[in-house]
């Protein structure tokens, strides 16, 4: 009798065969080993049987990790082992988390940990879709109140046709990289970047991916049934309906009034005062029954329902706007004198100070992946300090949220950057959020576009971003443009769109409820387009195209082409020559195999000096031309004269003077500087020189 009780399910998902397996590996957790094409991911789910005492939030943790052995590689670094999560691993952890979190019921506070480990990869495709499907399958057999399963799909657009789960080779030709996740009946999450595609193309990709993932959802359901998955016996905690009614009667109107205060800090102060009043009114001095916790919950629920009811009934939003109006904008560029490019973008109570720095190719980021090390010439770093929301907090490295927001902003900008062969600088953008009340990632997109143009980066088009929200109750719904932080928290959807006037460059969607129809998504996209165009128009009033020249403080870039056979002369023995040029001119030099030489100088003079030295080394000898030379060696039949770096010619004794001389040393000595003319260069590259009829200094 086997010690393993293995359950397997195989199905075809686009161009890939998918195998789900449980019962063989990591049997003390709810584990699924999923193989999709050439990728294998081990997903383990552990759920606590009960919630911790006093727990008032859902502690879900998702950790995605790539083992280097999966691709037959040994990690770098001193310890030669995997370290902290990379940025890519953090982003995929968030990608898995976002569609599963809203499928756990309100009030479920048991801790759940999901660990997805890539254990094998043929390096032809991303492992994120496999990890998401494996997580869905593991949760389906875990016995938790998970309202899944979910499916997930990557959608590309190649030659106008949607492609399901494209590999790396196909993605290189795609105008779209979109990941969509959802249940049988609803889309829950979208993450994408695009090359200025239309709203219809983006919506079509979302619907295509959702239709295709139904195969995976059906297979996971069958897999869970075969594995004997048991339904959860968790029961939602009951709430004190009598207390709910009393709170509503006493505070609904006051809360509604507080939500008309436009200034965030003043509004929060008013709501905190109302909460304290509710506690004083309804919580006894000796609270043995936990009434305080119930008041906290019901008060928050009343706030939630009040704001939503106001919006759906057509009342003004929290800050007095209607559903389509964008907050007041202020656009400034060139705000930092020494930065290569800078912008201060303010939208209501959200503000981003964004800078662009240009560097040479040696400043590029080296990224370690399972497929090997790659170079990234574009970076966008997003920082969200505690002071931006008027709070204190510990300053540390970037958190998951900051990494995710930075990547979204990067997606929004990347499609409009110039090609590397046209603009070979390394670009680093930093977005420091100085104020926040919703949509700071989209403010970062706007600020990035402005600072890039201020730095002189020739963008294909300016880009802007806007965050949309949704409130839906039954058949009634309202789509909100440019949402506040409160509207994000109290709404049913966070829908962020970035793009130019020509089309969408990034789309991110997180939906908290089912029932988001094609109609709602279409309304949201069209409303976002109108908002984006309004923001772009305001930005264009300040700066609409790149400055004609890059910042005077940025490194100067020059490019020349040399004979590929001369590359070794420029580099020199052991790199000595190029190192000497770099040290003398303080310029950075990059040479390609085809003879293209890129020179980055701290100043224009430094770049020109480096180019002059390179041209001196690589110049071709011209017959008939007179050169300043130096005698480097004297022999019986003449002298060898250096006329260019690395280039010597023979000055025969008969060509030293118009008169006959007996000994070379009667006229020349080693180290002597002379003017010589090139008589001839034979087919072996040997150079014949003469001093006859050449006036010497």
Curated annotation (Swiss-Prot):
Binding, Mg(2+): 488, 494
Domain (S1 motif): give its ranges. 624-692
Question: What's any GO biological process attached to this entry?
Answer: mRNA catabolic process
E.C. number: 2.7.7.8
Q: Which domain of life is it from?
A: Bacteria
Q: Where in the cell is it found?
A: Cytoplasm
Q: Where is the KH domain?
A: 555-614
GO CC terms of this entry = cytosol
What broad class describes the main subcellular location of this protein? cytoplasm
Instruction: Please list the cofactors this protein needs.
Output: Mg(2+)
Similarity section:
Belongs to the polyribonucleotide nucleotidyltransferase family.
NCBIfam families of this UniProt entry? polynuc_phos, PRK11824.1
Q: What is this protein called?
A: Polyribonucleotide nucleotidyltransferase
Tell me the lineage of the source organism: Bacteria, Pseudomonadati, Pseudomonadota, Gammaproteobacteria, Moraxellales
Supply the gene name. pnp
């Amino acid at each position: 009798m086997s010690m393993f009780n293995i359950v397997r399910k195989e199905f075809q998902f686009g161009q890939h065969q998918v195998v789900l397996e449980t019962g063989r590996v990591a049997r003390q957790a709810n584990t699924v080993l999923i193989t999709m094409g050439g990728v294998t991911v081990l997903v383990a789910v552990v759920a606590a049987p009960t919630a911790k005492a006093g727990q008032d939030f859902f502690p879900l943790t998702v950790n995605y990790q790539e083992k280097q052995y999966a691709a037959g590689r040994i990690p770098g670094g001193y310890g030669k082992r995997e370290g902290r999560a990379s940025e890519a691993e953090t982003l995929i952890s968030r990608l898995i988390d976002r569609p599963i979190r809203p499928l756990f019921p309100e009030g479920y506070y048991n801790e759940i940990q999901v660990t997805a480990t890539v254990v094998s990869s043929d390096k032809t495709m991303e492992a994120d879709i496999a990890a998401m499907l494996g997580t869905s399958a593991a949760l389906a057999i875990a016995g938790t109140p998970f309202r899944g399963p979910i499916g997930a799909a990557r959608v590309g657009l190649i030659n106008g046709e949607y492609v399901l789960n494209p590999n790396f080779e196909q993605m290189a030709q795609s105008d779209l990289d979109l990941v969509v996740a959802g249940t049988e009946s609803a889309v829950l999450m979208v993450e994408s970047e695009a090359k200025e595609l239309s709203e219809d193309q983006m919506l079509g990709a979302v619907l295509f991916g959702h239709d295709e993932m139904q195969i995976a959802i059906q297979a996971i359901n069958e897999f869970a049934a075969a594995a004997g998955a048991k339904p959860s016996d968790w029961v939602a905690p009951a709430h004190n309906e009598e207390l709910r009614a009393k709170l509503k009667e006493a505070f609904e109107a006051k809360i509604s009034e507080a939500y008309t205060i436009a200034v965030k800090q003043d509004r929060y102060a008013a709501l905190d005062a109302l909460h304290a009043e509710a506690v004083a009114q309804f919580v006894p001095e000796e609270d043995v029954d936990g009434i305080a916790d119930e008041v906290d919950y019901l008060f928050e629920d009343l706030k939630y329902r009040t704001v939503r009811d106001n919006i759906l009934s057509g009342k003004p939003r929290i800050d007095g706007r209607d559903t389509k109006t964008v907050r007041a904008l202020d656009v400034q560029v060139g705000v930092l004198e020494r930065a290569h490019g800078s912008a201060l973008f303010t939208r209501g109570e959200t503000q981003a100070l964004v800078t662009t720095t240009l560097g040479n190719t040696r400043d590029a980021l080296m990224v370690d992946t399972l497929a090997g090390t790659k170079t990234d010439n574009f970076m966008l770093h997003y920082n969200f300090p505690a002071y931006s929301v008027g709070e204190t907090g510990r300053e540390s490295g970037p958190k998951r949220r900051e990494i995710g927001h930075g990547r979204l902003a990067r997606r929004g900008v990347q499609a409009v950057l110039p090609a590397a062969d046209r603009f070979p600088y390394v670009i680093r953008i930093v977005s420091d959020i100085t104020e926040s009340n919703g949509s700071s990632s989209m403010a970062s997109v706007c600020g990035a576009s402005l600072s890039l143009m201020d730095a002189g980066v020739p963008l294909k088009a300016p880009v802007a971003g806007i965050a949309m929200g949704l409130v839906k109750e039954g058949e009634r719904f309202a789509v909100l443009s440019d949402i506040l932080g409160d509207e994000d928290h109290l709404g049913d959807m966070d829908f962020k769109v970035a793009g130019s006037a020509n089309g969408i460059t990034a789309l991110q969607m997180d939906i908290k409820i089912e029932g988001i129809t094609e109609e709602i998504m279409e309304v949201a996209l069209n409303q976002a387009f109108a908002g984006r165009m309004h923001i772009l128009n305001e930005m264009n009033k300040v700066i609409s195209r790149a400055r004609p020249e890059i910042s005077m403080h940025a490194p100067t870039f020059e490019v020349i082409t040399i004979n590929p056979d001369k590359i070794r002369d420029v580099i020199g023995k052991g790199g000595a020559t190029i190192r000497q040029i770099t040290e003398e001119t303080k310029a950075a030099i990059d040479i390609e195999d085809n003879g293209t030489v890129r020179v980055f100088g701290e100043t224009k003079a430094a770049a020109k000096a480096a180019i002059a030295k390179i041209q001196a080394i690589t110049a071709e000898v011209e017959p008939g031309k007179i050169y300043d030379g130096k005698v480097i060696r004297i022999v019986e039949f003449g002298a060898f004269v250096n006329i260019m770096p690395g280039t010597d010619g023979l000055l025969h004794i008969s060509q030293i003077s118009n008169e006959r001389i007996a000994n070379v040393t009667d006229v020349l000595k080693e180290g002597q500087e002379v003017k010589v003319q090139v008589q001839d260069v034979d087919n072996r590259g040997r150079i014949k020189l003469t001093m006859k009829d050449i006036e010497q200094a």
